[in-house]
Amino acid sequence: MNEIPKLDVEKTKNDIIEFVQNKVSEANADGLVVGLSGGIDSTLSAFLACEAVGKENVFGIVMPSTTTPTEDKLHGTAIAQLLGIEYKEIAIDSILNEFLSVTQIEDDKLAIGNLKARIRMSIIYFYANSKNYLVCGTGNRSEILIGYFTKHGDGACDIEPIGDLYKTDVYELAKFLEVPQEIINKPPRAGLWNNQTDEDEIGMTYELLDKILYRSTDKKIDSKSIAEELDISVDEVDDIITRVERNKHKTKVPESPKKTTMVI
């Protein structure tokens, strides 16, 4: 009754493709740039981008750093080659190190991790500008809702094709589109620092996270009822709800005070 509805993968694919085609046409753009991390979200986004505008109009960028698992870098380039798209690999460490040498801040793991995401997005937008392409985002609904992305980093894009799909939906659509099994099977990770995985940071599996988010956000069920239904603590539910509220600013245009309150 309160489970996430089963995804109609065929219709979802077609709806996303039509959405992407419309947005590229409206912007009078010539194609799409996609950052290829080697993970399931960017891989699925690249598959959909190729279906929407053709592989000849998709440009992929693989941007490893010293904390990027070798497997992820190899998967990023492998996906570009599998899809037959033009791509470029740019290691970001020289840019990162120059920035850190100027700012002289080298011991803030979170700030440095976010900086990596912002460096990558600057590179992506540079190529998008030069090619008259749109930046194709790779975020999913689960991560967007809890703010599990870097503001003005991996959260910056022109369109977000899979942004309304929960992470569990992403897996279903990826299987339907025949994304390579090794990418589907490996643990999601951002690679912003060593030995990092998404689920460790979030504090629960995506499966449980999605169940909480669907019930609290889509169905508007109260915390106590969700906790009882999922056999977890109310604190676990409230923590996710709090994260959703606390991170709403990440998806909004910066707010300003209303001029009507300032006039005489």
Per-segment meaning from a language model:
Residues M1-L32, L44, L48-E51, E56-F59, ...:
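ATP/NTP-dependent adenylation/nucleotidyl-transfer catalytic domains that generate, transfer
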Residues G35:
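Conserved beta-strand segments that form the floor/walls of ligand-binding pockets within enzyme
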Residues G39:
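Conserved G/P- and acidic residue-centered "switch" motifs that form tight phosphate/ATP-binding loops
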